[in-house]
From Swiss-Prot:
Signal peptide: none annotated. This is L-arabinose isomerase. GO terms for cellular component: cytosol. It comes from Klebsiella pneumoniae (strain 342). It catalyses: beta-L-arabinopyranose = L-ribulose. Binds 1 Mn(2+) ion per subunit. Its EC number is 5.3.1.4.
């Protein structure tokens, strides 16, 4: 059972009565076959549900209105099987507030060269029916996606599946509640921002709860529940001697388990799926939540440190998008550099809170080590290296008049040496196109020091996300050159200023 099981995507066929009842019967038969086959064979994350043909303005408007009010409907996939005059779609598309994709396909893959006639031509008109539909989308300035390809094509399946992930993520984001335990780290700029503007743009709400409210729940956890969770720790991780039974830091592990259970109960009771903490506001907690946060991220919660609600929300959004995909997604921070004559590297980490979904197959180490900030007891944490391979880091920032999403494509590499004195999980990567260009572009564009790191998602996923939410996207990849990058920032400033 995943979040995608809570949603469905409606499959809508556009046509008209011009071609007669027999043509419409064939259209319906084709649609049923296509939808049944896609549900059975395409490995789509969501179920497709075939809706009645849209052949009149009233029928189309009714479908769009129903989609808006059906909480299970994540979006509409439209196939223009025949020509469907686009003025019929205006009223429906005007009110539609769910994601929209045109599947530009046709029932037959190959033309029947020897038998093709005008009946066949009239029945299979995606080639120009889709263009008519595309015009009205452009004329109405309506955000929509297009996937071209035969309905049996695996690449088309993957692209539709990727769009479905975006559609479900958008619906989930509309209901997302972000809990901030305490406020921002004092005097930090990029983690602040306009929470009202964010709720208007994305739909998620952000509110602050006193750490004392959390502490009450943490203190209510029973010893039996703590013991059961620590047993899970024992089977899942390699505990250091200090963290084992009779170890000098065993109580710190028990305290971490209590915090994890209390945080999870608090989040569940409040309906929160993302949260932040700050080491400057820990009154009543015995340690900075480290292990608790790592394990909650692994369960799908969004998180960021120091009150960074934008990154916490983005992490939750990206975790929903990547559910079921290979590779993990985590809170991350660019921490320090390794300069090496063109083989420059970034070491990413945080004080404690890196998600185990990005770890290698080796069991993480559970250890308790001192933490120089926060003024609390030594916190428990998981220590691991990350998987290697292509990845991205993404940052969502508030520019005052708009939100900007920055994405840098990276290559995660093996750590060339052991790090015996570094008691935190970490990732090592090469920024693309190179560290100098990537870091300068990131800084010029205002990217945060906190990011969401993902092996599961790629640049195309984040581009779709930005388009679906109508926000600015700034890309740093192997094609990035600083002069043209700076030009693009200037053009974006003019473009988005004109839309105020």
């Amino acid at each position: 059972m995943t979040i995608f099981d809570n949603y469905e995507v409606w499959f809508v066929i556009g046509s008209q009565h011009l071609y007669g009842p027999e043509a419409l019967r064939q259209v319906t038969k084709h649609a049923e076959h296509v939808v049944n086959s896609l549900n059975a064979e395409a490995k789509l994350p969501c179920k497709l549900v075939l809706k009645p043909l849209g052949t009149t303005p009233d029928e189309i408007t009714h479908i769009c209105r129903d989609a808006n009010y059906d909480d299970k409907c994540a979006g509409l996939v439209v196939w223009l099987h025949t020509f469907s005059p686009a003025k019929m779609w205006i009223n429906g598309l005007t009110i539609l507030n769910k994601p929209l994709l045109q599947f530009h396909t046709q029932y037959n893959a190959a033309l029947p060269w020897d038998s093709i006639d005008m009946d066949f031509m009239n029945l299979n008109q995606t080639a120009h029916g889709g263009r008519e539909f595309g015009f009205i989308g452009a004329r109405m300035r309506q955000q929509h996606s297009v996937v071209t390809g035969h309905w049996q094509d695996k690449e088309a399946h993957q692209r539709i599946g990727g769009w479905m992930r975006q559609a479900v993520s958008k619906q989930d984001t509309r209901h997302l509640k972000v809990c901030r335990f305490g406020d921002n780290m004092r005097e930090v700029a990029v983690t602040d921002g306009d929470k009202v503007a964010a709720q208007i743009k994305f739909g998620f709400s952000v509110n602050t709860w006193a750490v004392g409210d959390l502490v009450q729940v943490v203190n209510s956890i029973s010893d039996g529940d703590i013991s059961a969770l620590v047993d899970e720790y024992e089977s899942s991780y390699r505990l250091t001697p200090a963290a084992q039974v009779h170890g000098e830091k065993r109580q710190n592990v028990l305290d971490a388990a209590r915090i994890e259970l209390g945080m999870k109960r608090f989040l569940e009771q409040g309906g929160f799926h993302a949260f932040t903490t700050t080491f400057e506001d820990l009154h009543g907690l015995k340690q900075l939540p480290g292990l608790a946060v790592q394990r909650l991220m692994q369960q799908g919660y969004g998180f960021a440190g120091e009150g960074d609600w934008k990154t916490a929300a983005l992490l939750r959004i990206m975790k929903v998008m990547s559910t079921g995909l290979q590779g993990g997604t985590s809170f991350m921070e660019d921490y320090t550099y390794h300069f090496d004559n063109g083989n420059d590297l970034v070491l990413g980490s945080h004080m404690l809170e890196v998600c185990p979904t990005i770890a290698t197959a080796e069991k993480p180490i559970l250890d308790v080590q001192p933490l120089g900030i926060g003024g609390k007891a030594d916190p428990a944490r998981l220590i691991f290296n990350t998987q290697t391979g292509p990845a991205i880091v993404a940052s969502l920032i508030d520019l005052g008049d708009r939100f900007r999403l920055l994405v840098n494509t990276i290559e995660t590499v093996p750590t060339p040496h052991d790090l015996p004195k570094l008691p935190v999980a970490n990732a090592l990567w090469k920024a693309q196109p190179d560290l100098r260009t990537a870091s300068e572009a990131w800084i010029i564009a205002g990217g945060a020091h906190h990011t969401v790191f993902s092996h599961a998602l790629n640049l195309d996923d984040m581009r779709q996300f930005a388009e679906l939410h109508n926000i600015e996207l700034t890309v740093i990849d192997n094609d990035t050159r600083l002069p043209s990058f700076k030009d693009a920032l200037r053009w974006n400033e003019v473009y988005y200023s004109s839309k105020r």
